[in-house]
Design a protein with these regions (language model features):
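PP2C/PPM-type serine/threonine phosphatase catalytic domain
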Residues: 1-313
Length: 313
């Protein structure tokens, strides 16, 4: 395989960095992963760190030199990562669990397979146009799961994440075939919240990937202003010819500290303290019930080629 990987991050207007970004690869496969520690919960940075390390370590152990089944790998690892965060909370006697979103992508045999939980996104672009992006696990991005939106929660509040006692919900994109020159971007909401999808996809092209990643980061920080969100992103360009991967190495080893993604906010006027663990657990249970009721319905396609989605119950 041959590919290029670049990343950028900026703390923006936030006081803390609670994001982690990482990648690792073999001669036949590559893994990208990004996690947003949720600032509304304690130890969000720890949750994000555990998530990224779990994915990286699992890939290193199983990609010899490639994964037996990328989708199965992603599905098993997201559950392991969430449980590892729960175990951390119990071991450190936390009364409230750390939480994080995650998005992870595997490229193997010329195909992209990705998984996400929460609102960290993957964008797949070709020739400056958006081919597909993930859909956030929020009331805004997945309204079809609800007859009515809960009155006490903002439409952007996430209904799933890693770190809950309830197994996380997730969606899988792919496997889909990549073409020479396709670009894949994983990012936090600090990036996508300040530009629309088409602008983001267009921004990935016209310049080398390293410049595109840097320019997108700078634009997001500038638009966010003094009180803007943190911005983190990692991009890959696929090259369909044999050879060694060309990468910008993250540090240390496979991990790099990136920028903190803000926690989902409750509805305007609702004190943040009212959105507690019990409410989150009730919301997740509601989602599971909605999914069970609609299991036989065909979900909207995320990608034009072989869309597949998985929602654990």
């Amino acid at each position: 395989v041959k590919f290029s990987v670049y990343q950028a991050s900026h703390i923006g207007g936030r006081a803390r960095n609670e994001d982690r970004v990482g990648y690792t690869y073999t001669r036949q496969a590559v893994l990208l992963v990004l996690a947003d520690g949720m600032g509304g919960h304690p130890d969000g940075d720890q949750a994000a760190d555990i998530a990224v390390r779990t994915f990286v370590q699992a890939f290193v152990g199983q990609a010899v030199p490639k994964l037996a089944d990328p989708r199965a790998f992603l599905e098993a690892t997201v559950m392991q990562a969430s449980q590892a965060i729960v175990d951390f909370a119990h071991a450190h006697h936390r009364t409230e669990h750390p939480r994080t979103t995650v998005v992870a992508a595997v490229v193997q045999d010329g195909e992209l397979t990705a998984l996400h939980s929460g609102d960290s996104r993957l964008y797949w672009a070709r020739d400056g146009r958006l081919v597909a992006r993930t859909r956030d696990h929020s009331y805004h991005d997945k309204p079809e799961l609800f007859a009515t939106r809960p009155a006490s929660v903002s439409r952007s509040v996430l209904f799933t994440c890693l770190g809950s006692d309830t197994p996380p919900l997730y969606d899988v994109l792919g496997p889909v075939a990549l073409r020479h020159g396709d670009r894949v971007l994983l990012c936090s909401d600090g990036l996508w919240a300040v530009m629309d999808d088409d602008d983001l996809a267009a921004g990935l092209y016209g310049v080398p990937l390293a410049d595109a990643v840097a320019q997108l980061s700078e634009l997001a920080v500038r638009r966010g202003g003094r009180h803007g969100d943190n911005v983190s992103l990692i991009g890959l360009e696929w090259q369909a010819d044999d050879g060694f991967p060309s990468t910008q190495v993250l540090e240390p080893a496979w991990l790099a500290h990136a920028a903190a993604a803000p926690a989902p906010l409750p509805a305007e006027g609702l004190p943040a303290a009212e959105l507690d663990d019990a409410e989150i657990e009730r919301t997740i249970a509601e989602i599971n019930d909605a999914i069970r009721r609609t299991r036989r319905q065909t979900p909207p396609a995320q990608v034009p080629t072989r869309p597949e989605r998985k929602r654990p119950s």
